[in-house]
Amino acid sequence: MKYILFSMAFIFLFTNCKKEDKQDPLLSQAKCVDINNPISISINDLITDIDTIGLEVTDSSLLGDIHMLHIMNNKLYILDTKGNAIYIFSRNGDFIRRIYHVGQGPEEYIRINGFQVDYKCNRLILTDSFSKRIFIFDEYGELLKVVPLKFSAYILMARNGGFLNFYTGPKQMYGLKDMENYNIHVLDSCGNFVASFLENQTPHRIDLESTERIDYNPNNEEILFHPTFGNVVYRIDKNNQIYPEYVFRNKSSFKLLTPKERREMTHIYGQKNEIEEKESEGYLLSWGCVYDLDDYCLFTMTGWNHPKHIYYNKSTGISVTIDMEKMKGDVSLCKLFNAPIYQTEGNCFYNIIPLYLVDELADKLPEGKLKTFLQNNNTPNSNPLIIKYKMKFPE
């Protein structure tokens, strides 16, 4: 009953908050993140404290296509979509175990679509959208429980004895209207739908899929969620109460979508791509990639082909915009650190460098630890390499 009442309250709340205007009282407490024109900066001045992790290669730990990385209790958990398995490594890269339960049996999955870590209970939450089930493992890879669902899930987090499901797929993904029209769904411990909140403001999207719209802080159990194309980033506390945390304020030459434009955005694969069209017209778009670090937040406005990064300093409230494609400095370093961010921890970022990029850049990098590391691991039998680093906030 409390979830139903909670849902009704927030349906009313967000129905009256469709205009993402800073004057709206619901947004008055949100922090303003200025979108400025990209600054001119060298990659050598931005990246600092570089460290490297080589993943041990054995007959059981040779990785193919790394899709996700999570860190819990000094262990690295890596989803390899090609191998359809979760690989567990120590923090320094020693192989521990592979989770591989492929099959048609009651305790077997067809394909892992995504996974999250449950820091509070030290568990792994694997989702299989094909069989519509959740597979829960302990931190060492032992299967604890299989939970059947009535819908396909991708990003699903353990929460208050149940789960939160985040709308991350194309339109008409769910059979229930209450799930289709709202971004976040509350599930009980058995995987049953209980309530929804945060209205979906992109009702016409078709083939658009987002994968990085949440960031979980294990210290306070809070989640940051950035709806597709939205100008507001929301905070969800450990009791599932939701608040506007950041609102973007445009001070750049880019254009942002109005609520009306966002509701009318359509993407039909092979037929119509309004995302690419809008970007070519000077719009700054986002799938909603947000990273919550100790001292600042990083918002990645991914658009279609030309990503921009917005860094927000929590202590000063100052934000800067960086276009990674127009960075100055060493070209090889620019290309290396333009790779996708897979995980954050404290003030550190983790990038996974595919072998083709290692082969291309190993001999071109400036002399030093990073170049030596890539050269020593540039073999056909190496695993993809992990780079851990910090970013020095631009002055």
Predicted regions, residues:
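Beta-strand-rich domains and repeat architectures in extracellular enzymes and scaffolds
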Residues: 50-84, 288
